[in-house]
């Protein structure tokens, strides 16, 4: 069996391409000019840092990072410890409470413990200017995260992809449903959650699919990282 690739190996060539270098340079220029860009530079690639390529069991695709102060830390839907859960995450917790027996809604919104169990929390755009949703949407991040999904699709099998909303579902057309499991629902935002996100049971369904493959299920109760 060949050695399983790491993200570093799998994306090394992509990171040398002009579009990627230009994206990083644009973000660096904005920060240097005094603009506030979220998440902080050290957190931009946290989805890859916390969930190595060979450890990915589940992928939850987000869109772009939260654009309010102290929220975004490089994991889709997650916020830093001490920051209230934003509305979409409140609805994710509501669904978990109805779907997973014994789930107690936590008093925080940090999902790092999911990432450390193999849930890749991937935004399709990795930076945003403070207060301006989708401000970095056309930089090149989408091309990069398309590559990430292609790598997951080709290098791995049996991943459970949770695609919430039209943006994630469009992105998910890259995924081969014969190799992977694709679960779709409306976005958990208050605008659409009642159209079928609430009641989708994606969390128990993901665990059932993992167990069918002989894998450990995810403990969906988020625990705070040790200080």
From Swiss-Prot:
Leader sequence residues: none
NCBIfam families given in the database record: PRK05254.1-1 (NF003588), PRK05254.1-2 (NF003589), PRK05254.1-4 (NF003591), PRK05254.1-5 (NF003592), ung (TIGR00628)
UniProt-listed SMART domains: UDG (SM00986), UreE_C (SM00987)
Main location: cytoplasm
Function summary: Excises uracil residues from the DNA which can arise as a result of misincorporation of dUMP residues by DNA polymerase or due to deamination of cytosine.
Protein EC: 3.2.2.27
Biological process annotations from GO: base-excision repair, AP site formation via deaminated base removal
Keywords: Cytoplasm, DNA damage, DNA repair, Hydrolase
One GO MF term attached to the UniProt entry: uracil DNA N-glycosylase activity
PANTHER family linked to this entry: URACIL-DNA GLYCOSYLASE
Species assigned in the record: Sodalis glossinidius (strain morsitans)
This protein's GO CC annotations: cytoplasm
InterPro entries for this protein: UDG_fam1 (IPR002043), Ura-DNA_Glyclase_AS (IPR018085), Uracil-DNA_glycosylase-like (IPR005122), Uracil-DNA_glycosylase-like_sf (IPR036895)
Family assignment from sequence similarity: Belongs to the uracil-DNA glycosylase (UDG) superfamily. UNG family.
Protein name: Uracil-DNA glycosylase
PROSITE patterns: U_DNA_GLYCOSYLASE
Catalytic residues in the record: 64 (proton acceptor)
